[in-house]
Amino acid sequence: ASPGRGELRFAPGGDLLDARGIRWHVDGELSALDATVHGGESTLSTPTYPDALARLWSALTCPTSGEVLLSAAPGYEFVDWGGAAHVGGGSHGSLHASDSLAPLVLCGVDLPDDPPGQWAIRDVASLITKHFDQRAADL
């Protein structure tokens, strides 16, 4: 990651633990992602770019992602192929918290015994799938 604030190299499996419980090896400038380390250099925090390392790693290892990744600055977005723009709402191409975080309200869904420290779409999708699969089985 290198947004003009330094270079940061990272990979899964190091000593730093993120908010979702994933361990990372990082080398370089944490300021590239406005990241900080807490608790004796063991907990990685990236509030400006939630779940930054996992989201970037997922994109970098996607076979169809290409070789360059960009994240739009707050207030800007990359218009999709159909020409749709959503400035001020959910947009295309930003890892920033203003485009990544949203309220989550659940009703009638069984929560996991050990919920993640930071929720992601993949967690919600799993809950909803389990909920409706169970309801279909009960019919």
Regions found by a protein language model. Give the residues of each.
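C-terminal alpha-helix
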Residues: 127-135
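Active-site neighborhoods of enzymes that stabilize oxyanions during catalysis
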Residues: 1-114, 119-125
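Polar, surface-exposed loop/tail segments
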Residues: 1, 134-139
